[in-house]
A protein has these predicted regions:
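Bacterial Sec-dependent N-terminal signal peptides
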Residues: 17-31, 413-416
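Bacterial N-terminal signal peptides
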Residues: 7-19
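Tryptophan (W) side chains
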Residues: 3-4
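Acidic/polar low-complexity interaction segments
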Residues: 24-191, 212, 216-233, 237
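Compositionally biased, intrinsically disordered low-complexity regions
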Residues: 21-24, 28, 36, 82, ...
Length: 416
């Protein structure tokens, strides 16, 4: 990363170091352009009612020195006293070691400039996530706790499992459902825009939060099912159902990120030149050819050329890639929108978001999951909202990409 830092320092010619707090209303801040090439910088307004020096916006708070043990949180989730997601997460975050994050900034007029790489990560992630949450509120019309509750974001967390340090993780970002936090990992060997500053990656991770809240915390049956399983230390779903739900979650995370950055090849600036950059490109060869049934049969094209792993009928072993099926789901929905970003953003994504609570309710009733459950919920919502063209395209996408599921028993909303 040294060459990258050298470029940063030569680009940001700063005059003074500022270490005090105070209002930054009306100021601007230099961040990484989260959807351009490696060293693209941009100056953006500090969000309203925010303070760039304390890294606080109405939607986001940045944290540092986060340390915790997964086993301790698992025990608390089983034994703790809490009524809902909000109280659980508030108490869980109170059990971990953490500090407010503080960037090193210099000020030129009304412009704040990061003085080191970590500070650039902090202010860039804060800016992008604040914009992402605004997008989910204004465009997607999400009204779950994911957009109502303050998002906590941790830079470089230190995680252990039963006292043993977690295997070193770099070049990544993740959403933790144990703490309702987004983790930003160190940048190491990655060639593209760092995950921690990529608007596509951060939108992907935030959609995981949206999925979690809407599926498990929007309806009483889903809440009861979720917490009953947790209290009794039971798996939420059988292996196959979990694999399919995880793949749905990943596919939607990619699709909502595409909607945010307005680019069906949203991850090309992140995974530069790697297999993932082609496998998760909604305009790429894999997305255009892949199908649910091909993955279920484990055709050699998937296992060898695209490294999708071994999962006969999605009874996966540890080497199976949920991202492969995720791309099939995302591509089917991209085709549903006619590969039109306006239709995707203004029509399809809000309908998908509204349908997520129906998934949780149905899982609570049936105790299992397959992708037909998701598509049936979305088709039913489109029908309720008199979106006939979208409904027809959804059903066509199921027929094209999920042929074995296309029947009146599994996707009845397409037939009645």
């Amino acid at each position: 990363m040294k060459w990258w830092l050298d470029h940063l320092y030569s680009t940001l010619l700063c005059a003074c170091f500022v270490g005090c707090s105070g209002s930054t209303q009306g100021d601007s801040v230099v961040v990484i352009d989260g959807h351009e090439d490696f060293a693209a910088l941009q100056t953006v307004p500090v969000p309203a009612a925010s303070d760039v020096q304390t890294l606080q916006t109405p939607h986001v708070t940045m944290r540092s020195n986060v340390r915790f043990d997964v086993a301790d949180l698992a025990d608390f989730r089983r034994d703790g006293q809490f009524a809902n997601f909000t109280s659980f997460y508030q108490q869980a975050r109170g059990r971990i070691s953490q500090d407010p994050a503080r960037p090193h900034l210099a000020k030129e007029g009304n412009k704040w400039v990061p003085q080191d790489f970590d500070s650039l990560v902090l202010v860039s992630a804060m800016h992008h996530l604040n914009s992402i949450i605004t997008y989910f509120i204004d465009v997607i019309k999400d009204n779950s706790g994911a957009t109502k509750n303050l998002l906590h974001v941790a830079i470089y967390p230190e995680i252990s499992v039963s006292g043993q340090p977690e295997y070193a993780v770099a070049d990544n970002a993740s959403y933790s459902f144990l703490l309702d936090m987004i983790f930003l990992r160190q940048s190491a060997t990655q060639r593209g825009v760092p995950f921690s500053m990529s608007s596509a990656v951060l939108a992907h991770e935030f959609q995981h939060r949206v999925f979690h809240y809407n599926v498990w915390n929007k309806t009483a049956p889903a809440q009861q099912y979720y917490w009953n399983k947790i209290r009794h230390e039971q798996q939420l779903l059988d292996t196959r159902s979990k694999n399919l739900l995880d793949a749905t979650d990943e596919g939607l995370a990619d699709l909502f990120a595409v909607g945010f950055v307005k680019d069906p090849s949203a991850f090309r600036h992140v995974f530069k030149g790697t297999l993932s950059s082609f496998r998760r490109d909604l305009q790429g060869g894999f997305a255009q050819e892949a199908s649910y049934d091909g993955l279920a049969r484990l055709d050699s094209w998937y296992a060898q050329q695209w490294q999708c792993g071994a999962a006969i009928n999605f009874q996966a072993n540890k080497n199976w890639s949920k991202y492969c099926l995720g791309t099939v789901i995302a591509r089917a929905l991209w085709e549903t929108a006619g590969q039109d970003l306006t239709v995707l953003r203004q029509q399809l994504l809000p309908v998908i978001n509204a349908s997520l609570q129906d998934i949780g309710s149905t899982i609570a009733q049936q105790g299992k999951y397959d992708v037909d459950l998701f598509f049936n919920a979305v088709v039913a919502r489109a029908t309720q909202q008199n979106m006939q063209s979208l409904r027809e395209q959804l059903c066509l996408s199921v027929w094209r990409r999920f042929r074995s599921l296309y029947n009146p028993l599994q996707v009845p909303a397409c037939f009645f």
